[in-house]
Amino acid sequence: MRCRSVALVWREWKWRGVGDKRQSRLIFLNLPSTLNPDTFRKTLLSPATLKSTTITDTKLVPKRRFAFVGYKDAEEAQKVKEWFDGTYAFGGGKVKVDFVKDEPLKTGDKLNRGEKSKEKRSKEGRDNVQEKQEPNKRLQEFMSVMKGVDPAMASPEASTSTAEGTKKEKSVKGKEKSEEPEEAEADDDDAAWLRRRQAALEGEPSTPQLSADEQLILSTSRLFVRNLAFITTSESLSSHFSTYGRIDECHLPVSQTTGEPLGTAFLQFHNAEDALAAYKALDKTIFQGRLLHVLPGRAKPGQEGAAAGSGVVDGKVLGKRDEGRGEVKSKVDAKRKQESAKGVNWASLYMNSDAVAASVADRMGISKSELLNADSGNSAVKLALAETTVIEETKKYFEEAGIVLESLQPRVPRSQTTILVKNIPYGTSIQSLTDLFAPHGKLTRVLLPPAGTLGVVEFENHMDAGRAFKALAYRRLGNAVLYLEKGPVGMFKSETAPGVGPISTEQKREEEAKALAEKVESLPEQPDPTDEAGSTLFLKGLNFTTTTPHLQTVLSHIPGFSFARVQMKPDPKRPGEKLSMGYGFVGFKTKEAATKALKALEGFEIDGKSLEVKFAQRGAEDDRETKKGGDAEGGKTKSTKVLVKNLPFEATKKDVRELFSAYGQLKSLRLPRKAVPTSTGAQSTRGFAFLEFTTHTEAARAMEALKHTHLLGRHLVLQWANEGEEVDIKGLREKVKGEVRGMEDGGDRKRRKLDFKGGKEDEMDGLEV
């Protein structure tokens, strides 16, 4: 059952403010007193235009003839208000509908108003008492004088008390005199005396005192939110609270029996000040039609009352197993595990090098020592080529399983139910992977390629996926440590999962047929061999909603029609989808038919857009695609030069040549080196290289195959090289030559000026191949 605070319900009944600001919560006034909740809810959903609205909360008070209704967002509430306001839809009188406004923030004056009035009353009371007591003292003094008897002679006790009272009065007068500010000296000016006077009157400013709840928030940076709608997701809640600061974690508990949300959430902020600001601003405000109740959140279980021997590193409590380990290593391990869910820490297709070598060696029927023979001198290249082979097999398997490979990019939104399992040791079976993740929740999909080096696990519930991610991140499996990463959104082509385990043969054939059909559709249609040259028209100004089938249907009635297509490009926001480029081509069997169609189609409207038609130039189509949509393989130009970044400094020219020559013939290879030699006397490489292939196809093949490959543990970053980059390298080389030559010159200052224009070439820089 939904837990609601008694104080929150009473506050909502007591205060019913309305306003002009659009909110997701409405108040209905002047309702019939005989209206029941079921009839009220059915009436709200009865209009056809309001059937799609989502009601998150209803509270009807028939005796007072008003009701509160909450909706998913302000747009839905606006539609309902416009429909029911001023109508007689519920029977009885005219109904008034308005937005419920948030409770105004309490100011300091309102908070202290009661305290100030209380102090004022107490002060007035003390003054009255003193006024009442003063006449009594005078009366006693008058009566003692009028007795005519010496008080000291009549009563020794009275004389003693009188003497003590005199001393006490003198001491009080002396104290009052000492408390008075000293008179200004003669030589002091009026401004100095005024400053001393004001400082004495004002005193020290009082520091604001924090409540216990605020102190708890500042210590934990955590908030507990309740009274949420059941449709609330972690994304929507994080988006609502993230306006006040970065949120590291958003946890929405669900019922263990039904799997339904409980209407509560825990929010972990990165900064404690941001959490306190969100607590003050969003408590008792409206979100998705319900009044939020924000409370301070306690620390996570396991972080409270940490033992004295276990420290806290970056907010993470180190357990007993961290005792005795190095301080630096413990910090690194704790921070890495804590930040594992915040971003992408590894390449999407990262694989264990030992598992790759074992997989390839097992297929070849040899041992790993024979594969990675130290005497051969190219073990790193062999391992990189083996990793490339395994990655190609893995990509092919994932394509057959319905995974969009274009979605495996580092900067894309991450799914809350899909987990990439990396660094798996060789020999791990799909059953062992299922047994590892199944205890944390219901699985809908488990994929493991034949090489067994990378897996994909999908949960039915995002809460189970988050629990498994926290429990299994950096956990040891066999002789390796698991690296987990949240899968990208839109990773699978279809929402329906094929189930746990490998896909069936029938499903595999269906996926292959579907993939083949999509591949055929993506290929440019070739005109009939009998078509004459110059019989293709270029259509410009197409509507971006116009598709190829629709264009074919419209133009197929033209005599001599051969083919028609709309030029498409990949959608960067939705992997696997395509966008129209706004132009297309239509082919005819003869040039005469194309000429007639040119005259007929000029200015013709398709989907509300007027066409611009002209003859297409043979061979110019690819150039036009390259300029507007970009070449999927070659970037902006059909270049044959590749820039390789993130090369390890230990890599030699021989290693790079052997690695890339497996995919094409290299025309040239340049591996720039640093001008200043190292302590050993050798010139270290600068971490990048330029490669030139004989053809663009070979260069594209190498880039596609090696873009996920690691060489000596470093991920190779491949880009198309521009001519300007090589010119910059040459200019930098000449600049370094001039600097060194200027440093070596002796004599006066004029002769030691640096020559940035370069001079006679020498071999000191080692940049030439």
Swiss-Prot record:
Organism domain of life: Eukaryota
| Subcellular localization, as worded in the UniProt entry | Nucleus
Q: Write out the ranges of the annotated region (Disordered).
A: 105-139, 151-191, 617-637, 740-769
- The biased composition feature labelled Acidic residues covers 179-191
Give the UniProt entry's GO cellular component terms.
nucleus; ribonucleoprotein complex
Q: Note the InterPro entries from the entry.
A: Mrd1_RRM3, Nucleotide-bd_a/b_plait_sf, RBD_domain_sf, RRM_dom, RRM_MRD1_RNA_proc_ribogen
Which Pfam families does this one have? RRM_1
Instruction: List the GO biological process terms.
Output: rRNA processing
SMART domains from the UniProt entry: RRM (SM00360)
MF terms from GO for this chain are: mRNA binding
Record's keyword annotation contains RNA-binding = yes
The RRM domain extends over 24-102, 221-299, 417-489, 535-618, 640-723
Family, as annotated = Belongs to the RRM MRD1 family.
| Described function | Involved in pre-rRNA processing.
Protein name from the UniProt record = Multiple RNA-binding domain-containing protein 1
